[in-house]
Amino acid sequence: ILASVGVVAYNGYTTSAQRSAAASNHNSVVKWIQNEYQKCSIGEKTAMNANLTCVDDADLPADAAAVAAATIKSQQATTAKMNNPYTKTAAVQNTGTAVPTICSTTNRGQIVITTDSDNVVVTTCQAAKDGDTTNLLSDTIALN
């Protein structure tokens, strides 16, 4: 009996830890984009591990698509070390991955980076419950 209670408690712990890790990954990517983009505004020539070429300050904002592409490339590098807590694969998805509108067991832990005008949008499904929108995180980073 104690063994079955332990298994249930362990499964609850790991599910909670995975959800927290997915949310932490999401927040880290959002902050990283904001911080790296600021390098361009203080005169750096490149940002995002040299995947983004900064434009002159007068030309800011940079092309949102370029920022999104640089983010994806940087976060998928072998040195990035940010993995999906559910699948242990790269958390940040390739360009063209559909933005999740609901969470499912196939998109949990995935970070999708897209653009909307002069904005970069980061969307993550932090938990696995199918058809759930309450576990969906989305942040819009204004580049202007």
Predicted regions and their residues:
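A general marker of short, structured functional hotspots
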Residues: 6-9, 33, 82
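Extended, polar beta-sheet/loop recognition surfaces of beta-rich domains
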Residues: 20-44
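Periplasmic/extracellular, small/polar-rich flexible segments of pilin-like filament-forming proteins
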Residues: 35-144
